[in-house]
């Protein structure tokens, strides 16, 4: 049995910028929502998709914005995209999916929490997202990332091959090299290659010596790297905290059975399809009744 966890925020962004725009009868832009509805419906046609949860950033800001002023916000998001977040959540719910609309936490936190809670109860957890933050959740072949657009699966060896560090060190990697998508600046001069080398040896930021003379590996520019980290170690630890996904999100589902997909909600889906001007989908979806 597999548990599929969907990154609704990523999917909505992908559809908004990748699918044709479309307006409903009221003149509202709904193209991304129509696309995500079709995409999720297609996913549910797969025989191995039996238990599913989808997380959305109901608001972009989270507890991380209270920790660091430079962390990502909703500023600059296209209004036509932002207006479709509630519709996309409705679409997922109408399909009968468990939906986690995050406010205090982020969508990625919900996916990490669900993974931690249910990974040992299934054969595999498939996190449908290419987001590098989520690589920290990968565990052997039990928990994998699946980029649906490119149909690429990352298990633990693949994460190491791609990023140079094991999943557990992904927050350390992002803290040091930075993550522009999340507003994490990183530590000056710490590039991806040198950071991977250092973390491969020491495992975590906390274990990296301040004094370059104490390093027992050869890394280009080691003196500068050590000096910069020593000067900004407190910042680095904050960035690591920002990059570390929370697994203590209070998800209401306590049993794997709560995530079983039993079919779409006929009344809700018919109403939503009428709003979106989407009619052909109703012929393809299995309903709970």
What function would you assign to each model-found segment?
Residues 50, 193, 279:
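Short acidic/polar active-site loop segments enriched in Thr and Asp
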Residues 1-96, 150, 268:
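Domain-level signal for Mg2+-assisted phosphodiester chemistry and nucleotide/NA-binding surfaces
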Residues 22-23, 74-250:
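Extended two-metal-dependent nuclease catalytic cores across DNA- and RNA-processing enzymes
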Residues 9, 59, 169-172, 176-178, ...:
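Low-complexity, charged, repeat-rich alpha-helical/coil interaction segments
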Residues 231-232, 236-289:
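Low-complexity, acidic/Ser/Thr- and charged residue-rich accessory regions of DNA metabolism proteins
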């Amino acid at each position: 049995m597999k548990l599929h966890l969907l990154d609704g925020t990523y999917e909505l962004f992908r559809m908004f910028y990748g699918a044709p725009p479309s307006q409903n009868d009221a003149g509202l832009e709904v193209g991304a929502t129509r696309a995500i509805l079709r995409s999720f419906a297609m996913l549910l046609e797969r025989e191995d998709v039996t238990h599913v949860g989808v997380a959305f950033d109901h608001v972009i800001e989270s507890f991380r914005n209270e920790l660091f002023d430079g962390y990502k916000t909703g500023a600059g998001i296209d209004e036509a995209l932002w207006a479709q977040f509630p519709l996309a959540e409705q679409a997922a719910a109408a399909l009968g999916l468990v939906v986690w609309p995050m406010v205090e936490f982020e969508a990625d936190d919900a996916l990490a929490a669900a993974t931690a809670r249910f990974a040992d109860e299934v054969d595999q957890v498939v996190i449908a997202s290419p987001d590098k933050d989520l690589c920290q959740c990968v565990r052997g072949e039990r928990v994998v990332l699946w980029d649906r657009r490119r149909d690429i699966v990352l298990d633990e060896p693949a994460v190491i091959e791609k990023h140079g560090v094991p999943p557990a060190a992904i927050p350390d990697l992002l803290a040091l090299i930075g993550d522009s998508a999340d507003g994490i600046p990183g530590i000056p001069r710490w590039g991806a290659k040198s950071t991977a080398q250092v973390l491969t040896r020491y495992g975590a930021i906390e274990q990296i010596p301040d004094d370059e003379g104490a390093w027992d590996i050869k890394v280009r520019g080691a003196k500068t790297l050590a000096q910069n980290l020593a000067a900004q170690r407190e910042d680095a630890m904050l960035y690591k905290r920002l990059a570390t996904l929370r697994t203590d999100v209070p998800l209401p589902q306590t049993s794997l059975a709560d995530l079983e997909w039993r079919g779409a909600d006929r009344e809700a889906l018919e109403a939503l399809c009428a709003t979106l001007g989407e009619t052909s989908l109703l012929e393809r979806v299995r309903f709970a009744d």
